[in-house]
């Protein structure tokens, strides 16, 4: 029996146990990837803290890059040896949402993977040596190998470092969905990004890539604001020192922004985002909140000022990942500059502990071969 190493979340908490699992086998329409890198994301952190319900034991990690190691029957879009990346939303391609082009809310992904830790035949691909199943969060990228549906495997262009490409599958992918598909940013728009962590920084650079004239980055961390400026923010606001709503109003001559992106998932930042948009503007909620978190809403203000409040959860893998890869290959979005820390599999929990303390600038990645 062939095995691999994986960082397993045995129970709620910020510690992984690196153990041997059976080498996963791809079934029909599936691809096995030898993982080069996996991004360290707040969404996984919510699972670790118990703020998002997910079966345990499980393997987390939902943005990966690597080399195709094996393919199942019927796979034609990639070949063994290809350098590939996968997005965190793995579309089934068959449910009522997927057939309408709404792969970002694929029913099977939520029903099987996010709730049960399985792929779409109702089974995980991860098993302990004794045959005990282990849940998969997306493709379970915190491991040496990962099995992914072929609907979610995309060839990485030559010239893009494979380890850096991992973050395209969530933090950049999520930003593309919010900016392009939900907000529909147009040339000349003014934008605020509330919270510039891994996703927020990409909202900054993607908004600029799609023509936003002013991009106001808002955070409490000076180093994150400085990186946001380097990635294209025209203005930065430290909300620990300044009222962010008043600052945005001042920057926009009292009007407010056309679009405010909220990338933290906290009640106060959501309320601030709503308060800083112009009449007829849009608030796009991107940050994942712990279960049960609610925010206050001034209904009369929203109605009278025709403010749109929109949710955005990722993007459409088969439609949008090719665009993500093109923008990265052309240098219109930067990925290497966003990765500040790299860890081996044995130190994956250290990466998440630092993320929990707010110490990661941009994005950290875990490289299982490191």
Language-model-detected regions and their locations in the chain:
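Cysteine-cluster motifs in flexible loop/terminal segments that predominantly coordinate metals
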Residues: 88-145, 149-151
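Residues located in well-ordered beta-strands
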Residues: 5-7, 17, 22, 34, ...
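Mid-domain Rossmann-like dinucleotide-binding core that forms the NAD(H)/NADP(H) cofactor-binding site
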Residues: 80-83, 144-145, 151-153, 157-242, ...
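Short Gly/Pro-enriched turn/cap motifs at secondary-structure boundaries
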Residues: 22-23, 55-61, 79, 134-138, ...
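C-terminal hydrophobic helical "lid"/dimerization subdomain
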Residues: 1-2, 271-275, 318-370
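Glycine-rich cofactor phosphate-binding loops and adjacent beta1-alpha1 units
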Residues: 183-187, 210, 220-222, 226-308, ...
């Amino acid at each position: 029996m062939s095995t691999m190493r994986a960082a397993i979340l045995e129970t709620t908490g910020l510690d992984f146990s690196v153990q041997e699992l059976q080498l996963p086998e791809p079934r029909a329409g599936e691809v096995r990837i030898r993982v080069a890198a996996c991004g360290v994301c707040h969404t996984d952190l919510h699972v670790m803290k118990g703020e998002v319900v997910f079966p345990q034991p499980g393997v987390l990690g939902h943005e990966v890059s690597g080399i195709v190691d094996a393919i199942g029957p019927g796979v034609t879009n990639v070949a063994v040896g290809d350098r590939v990346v996968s997005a965190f939303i793995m579309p089934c391609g068959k449910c009522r949402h997927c057939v309408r082009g709404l792969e970002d809310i694929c029913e099977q992904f939520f029903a099987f993977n996010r709730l049960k830790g399985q792929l779409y035949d109702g089974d995980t691909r991860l098993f302990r040596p004794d045959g005990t199943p282990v849940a998969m969060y997306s493709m379970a990228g915190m491991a040496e190998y990962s099995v992914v549906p072929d609907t979610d495997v995309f060839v990485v262009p030559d010239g893009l470092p494979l380890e850096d490409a991992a973050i395209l599958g969530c933090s950049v992918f999520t930003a593309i969905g919010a900016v392009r598909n939900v907000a529909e940013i147009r040339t000349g728009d003014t934008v605020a990004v509330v919270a510039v962590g891994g996703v927020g920084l990409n909202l900054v650079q993607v908004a600029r890539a799609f023509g936003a004239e002013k991009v106001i980055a808002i955070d409490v961390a000076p180093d994150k604001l400085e990186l946001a400026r380097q990635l294209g923010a025209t203005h930065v606001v430290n909300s620990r020192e300044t009222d962010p709503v008043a600052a945005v109003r001042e920057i926009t001559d009292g009007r407010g922004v056309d679009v405010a992106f909220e990338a933290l998932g906290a009640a106060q930042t959501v309320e601030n985002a709503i308060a800083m948009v112009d009449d007829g503007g849009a608030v796009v909620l991107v940050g994942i909140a712990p279960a049960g978190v609610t925010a206050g809403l001034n209904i009369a203000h929203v109605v009278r000022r025709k403010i749109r409040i929109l949710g955005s959860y990722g993007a459409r893998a088969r439609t949008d990942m090719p665009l993500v890869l093109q923008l990265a290959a052309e240098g219109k979005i930067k990925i290497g500059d966003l990765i500040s820390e790299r860890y081996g599999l044995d130190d994956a929990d250290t990466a998440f502990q630092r993320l929990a303390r707010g110490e990661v600038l941009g994005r950290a990645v875990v490289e299982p071969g490191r």
